[in-house]
Design a protein with these regions (language model features):
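Acidic, PIN/NYN-like endoribonuclease modules and their adjacent C-terminal/linker elements
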Residues: 1, 28, 43, 70, ...
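Short, well-structured N-terminal submotif of metal-dependent ribonuclease cores
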Residues: 1-37, 50-62, 120-133
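Short glycine-/small-residue-rich flexible loop motifs, especially phosphate/cofactor-binding loops
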Residues: 47, 61, 95, 114
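Alpha-helix capping/helix-boundary segments
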Residues: 8-9, 42, 76, 94, ...
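Amphipathic alpha-helical segments within well-ordered protein domains
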Residues: 7-10, 47, 81, 99
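Alpha-helical elements of the RecA-like P-loop NTPase motor core of helicases
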Residues: 20, 48, 78, 114-115
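Acidic catalytic patch
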Residues: 63-85
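Short beta-strand scaffold positions
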Residues: 4, 37-38, 71, 89-92, ...
């Protein structure tokens, strides 16, 4: 199971430097049978970002359809609130949910979240295409 953070999924609806890399990475993971998962917080964050950037809701929903969205648990919120460090609320909630779900990997592009995830014992990835030599 691969937990996907908003910083990664947003690249699937907004053209950014790593957009092709993360799309390829997640497509390959799905082809291998890995499930993509996130908390319902992703639904809210992605739709709000879509509204701000005038991204059609249909495109946002198409991307979300490939991700298993799980409900937040009260324990996720409590655990996120108790986390040491300087994570923003949403990042702490995503990390708490990934830990509860025992995700094998967290895909994100937020440096603070990635650092906290590694400190919590999770494997992490921020896919980028490496130039060929």
């Amino acid at each position: 199971m691969i937990y996907v953070d908003t910083s990664a999924v947003l690249k699937l609806v907004v053209a950014e430097e790593e957009s092709a890399s993360v799309a390829d990475y997640l497509s390959e993971a799905a082809a291998r049978g890995d499930s993509l998962v996130a908390s319902m917080l992703l639904y809210t964050e992605l739709h709000c970002a879509g509204h701000r950037r005038r991204i059609p809701a249909g495109l946002v929903n198409d991307v979300l359809a490939g991700i298993n969205l799980v409900d937040l648990a009260r324990s996720d919120l409590m655990f996120a609130a108790a986390m040491p460090g300087h994570l923003r609320s949403a990042d702490a909630i995503h990390l708490a949910t990934a830990i509860r779900l025992q995700a094998a990997l967290l895909v994100a592009y937020d440096t603070e979240l990635l650092t906290a995830a590694v400190e919590a014992g999770l494997d992490v990835a921020s896919p980028t295409h490496q130039p060929e030599h």
